[in-house]
């Protein structure tokens, strides 16, 4: 159901402030039966105290049984139907990087990967190289591959193993399958067109993959590329129009900046490299008076899960917990903490499991949940929500929705 027409009628501007904190991939699983999840293993005294004052529940970001990507997971949290408002990873990276991304262009998100002599994937992320190494390799590709046939090829560094390619030329469609096999021990997949208009794009992507491998054959780790999320530039309703908010985003990684800008948030500058939690906290404090909705993104919980690093994910949760008192001191009227999907270290991948949701607001019914964990969230008064149901709840608790109906 598309609630946007209804919310557009009911939304009203108020001075109250909403803070949505997304701990990327926060949901987890025990490493062994009966053991703790990452959240249960973490020492989180500040989150524990907050949970006692808040309402908890579980949230299925997109749909039961579906393991969502960060794109649909976030869009649902922002109130956008992820089955209607579809955007590829390439477009999100292009928007987040501020790349020269024009109508008719096709953007693809790339991973530098390590391939063995037989062309099989050894490491899908090339050992997560420093961004400086990425920049060096991208410079090499820019010089060696300015175009494929008569189509311009534009390379951009994103971060670590991530990069962006923008294809510019005539007759390019974006209905193209990914080349990332999503596991090691297999060669990169061949891109395939899903419609007639995208046949040329698929062929060019395959040629580009071969050419990149030739250029990078002497690189010890970054000697191949995996592509996904081919997409053109989309146009979505803006949060200002639908919710009457003045929204801001605090994120470090281009994809999440792209998601935020796509729905109308102003992306605030963040000092520091990587997840830069201290820089994000500084940006939140310095801009607190200018906006009434803040999206605050924490990435490394997801990265540790994808690497299968259970204890690393525990540490990232604990690092966030240490910042929480300074965040709470700002006094948000409505605070929500949740995830865009689960990334259990046990699975080393996004999963279909619900994520915990914590909501603190003035008019909440008390519940029995005492920690921000998956098991405790099951006891909470919020029940089990879908991702798209979160934004109306935040708006209501912030006093930003009028009564519906007579």
Curated annotation (Swiss-Prot):
UniProtKB keywords: Glycolysis, Isomerase
Reactions listed under catalytic activity: (2R)-2-phosphoglycerate = (2R)-3-phosphoglycerate
UniProt cross-references to SUPFAM superfamilies, sorted A to Z: Alkaline phosphatase-like
Pfam families: Metalloenzyme, PhosphMutase
The keyword Ribosomal protein is assigned to this record: no
Keyword Cell membrane: no
This enzyme's EC code(s): 5.4.2.12
GO BP, one annotated term: glycolytic process
GO molecular function: metal ion binding; phosphoglycerate mutase activity
Pathway entry: Carbohydrate degradation; glycolysis; pyruvate from D-glyceraldehyde 3-phosphate: step 3/5
Record CDD domains: iPGM_like (cd16011)
Recorded family membership: Belongs to the BPG-independent phosphoglycerate mutase family. A-PGAM subfamily.
Function, in words: Catalyzes the interconversion of 2-phosphoglycerate and 3-phosphoglycerate.
Protein name: Probable 2,3-bisphosphoglycerate-independent phosphoglycerate mutase
Gene this protein is translated from: apgM
